[in-house]
Regions:
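A conserved beta-strand-loop-helix scaffold within acyl/acetyltransferase catalytic domains
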Residues: 1-26
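Short, well-structured alpha-helical interface segments that form or flank functional binding sites
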Residues: 14-17, 32-36, 40, 70-77
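Conserved acetyl-CoA-binding loop-helix of GNAT-fold acetyltransferases
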Residues: 24, 29-47
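Terminal substrate-recognition subdomain of acyl/acetyltransferases
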Residues: 51-182
Length: 182
């Protein structure tokens, strides 16, 4: 019996390990099982010698965090124990293809770095964002959609990137918020 699964992507330009998805059967959603599973994943990436600088994931934050589902709240606790921080900036989870336009949701990016940080420059944040949106989401759909569908999806990614970019002023330093205190 399968108890769970996870999906990760390695984005080599910025050396990002991006956690796309993690699912665990209901009977295993306990601290005593979920946390060791997550820790094993973290150890796996460490033991493989994969040269990474950033570990990033996203968690939905609908209506200013008023509607965080139980699983997301639990994952947030686990990320706090693993010393992740919340990137305090506008973000959204992109649509899951062209036919699911309503699937994009407000979200937060959660970040763990190889070196301690408490703020990100706008430039670094935008590099990380570009890598996630273009090298991960956009490139995924480039091979999954027809040419015309991909052009539409690509333009959607461009528009959303520009929307987030314009929401951050040039001199902004983006705070990294402790998961525990937020």
């Amino acid at each position: 019996k399968i108890g769970g699964c996870s999906q990760f992507a390695f984005l080599p330009k910025m050396k990002i390990i991006f956690m796309d998805y993690m699912a665990i059967a209901d009977e295993y959603k306990k601290n005593s099982i979920f946390y060791p599973f997550f820790s094993m994943l973290m150890l796996y990436f460490n033991d493989t010698g994969l040269d990474n600088s950033y570990f990033i994931t996203e968690i939905g934050a609908q209506n200013n965090d008023k509607y965080v589902d139980h699983d997301s709240a639990f994952l947030r606790k686990v990320l706090a124990m693993e010393n992740f921080s919340i990137i305090d900036s506008p973000y959204f989870q992109p649509c899951l293809g062209n036919n699911k336009i309503g699937s994009n949701i407000d979200a937060h990016l959660y970040l763990k770095t190889s070196a301690p940080l408490n703020k990100l420059s706008k430039e670094l944040f935008l590099k990380l964002l570009r890598e996630i949106l273009y090298e991960h989401y956009d490139s995924w759909y480039k091979i999954m959609l027809s040419n015309s569908e991909y052009k539409e999806y690509h333009q959607y990614i461009v528009n959303e990137y520009e929307r987030i970019e314009s929401a951050i002023t040039l001199n902004d330093k983006i705070e990294l918020i402790d998961c525990v205190s937020s």
